[in-house]
Swiss-Prot record:
Domain-level remarks: Late-budding domains (L domains) are short sequence motifs essential for viral particle budding. They recruit proteins of the host ESCRT machinery (Endosomal Sorting Complex Required for Transport) or ESCRT-associated proteins. Matrix protein contains one L domain: a PPXY motif which potentially interacts with the WW domain 3 of NEDD4 E3 ubiquitin ligase (Potential).
Compartments, record wording: Virion membrane; Host endomembrane system
InterPro entries: Rhabdo_M, Rhabdovirus_M_sf
Organism: Aravan virus
Biological role: Plays a major role in assembly and budding of virion. Completely covers the ribonucleoprotein coil and keep it in condensed bullet-shaped form. Inhibits viral transcription and stimulates replication. Plays a major role in early induction of TRAIL-mediated apoptosis in infected neurons.
Note: Most abundant protein in the virion.
Cellular component, GO, one term: host cell endomembrane system
Pfam families in the record: Rhabdo_M2
Annotated Gene3D superfamilies: Rhabdovirus matrix protein M2
MF (Gene Ontology): structural constituent of virion
Disulfide-bonded cysteines: none
Family membership: Belongs to the lyssavirus matrix protein family.
Protein name (record): Matrix protein
Encoding gene (name): M
Keywords annotated in UniProt: Host membrane, Host-virus interaction, Membrane, Phosphoprotein, Viral budding, Viral budding via the host ESCRT complexes, Viral envelope protein, Viral matrix protein, Viral release from host cell, Virion
Length: 202
């Protein structure tokens, strides 16, 4: 029986591995940019529950025999049930996970590492989201382990409010990020004040 469970297993880099030949995507890589829902302050009509966050996210995948997004998606479909971080920021974490996994991984021994560092603008529905000035330091390992496959998913997300301005972003709505957000059941609703803006409900 396939069991999704939260356990701690170390995925250490192997020192005898050859140097990585794949580099990280450049900072301006469009694959890493958030969707139209998250736009700079100057483009947002309703600013009541808007927050600018400086975000650092890292997802490390440990799998001795490689991995497929089929298993990753299966793990993320249970994300609400295993998430151990601040519940007021679960929506932000889901967005960062989707964006990070849309980039290109950097191999580190037996691990594949996805990273994102961005200033993102979020809007939450009334009474939702983090408290003003609240910061997030979230770290968790979720492991899939059955008779045929092992995958360790190490997730780290840090987020703090900041005042750095951004630019208008867009992403293909059929992209991997949107697929992963759907898997994680990211909850949003269209803003009554701005038809181009979606509000996070979590």
């Amino acid at each position: 029986m396939n069991i999704l469970r939260k356990i701690v297993k170390s995925c250490k880099d192997e020192e005898d591995q050859k140097p990585a030949l794949v580099s990280a995507p450049p900072d301006d890589d469009d694959l890493w940019l958030p969707p139209p829902e998250y736009v700079p302050l100057t483009e947002i009509t309703g600013k009541k529950n808007m927050r600018n966050f400086c975000v650092n996210g890292e997802i490390k995948i440990c799998s001795p025999n490689g991995y497929s997004f089929r298993i990753l998606r299966h793990i993320l479909k249970s994300f609400d049930g295993v998430y151990s971080g601040n519940r007021r920021m679960i929506g932000l974490v889901k967005v960062v996970i989707g964006l990070a996994l849309s980039g290109a991984p950097v191999p580190e021994g037996m691990n594949w590492v996805y990273k994102i560092r961005r200033t993102l603008v979020f809007q939450w529905a009334e009474s939702r989201g983090p408290l003003d000035g609240e910061e997030l330091e979230y770290s968790q390992e979720i492991t899939w382990d059955d008779d045929s496959e092992f995958i360790g998913l190490q997730i780290r997300v840090s987020a703090r409010q900041c005042h750095i301005q951004g630019r208008v972003w867009c992403i293909n709505m059929n992209s991997r990020a949107c697929q992963l957000w759907s898997d994680m059941s990211l909850k949003t609703q269209q803003s009554d004040e701005d038809k181009n803006t979606s509000l996070l409900l979590e």
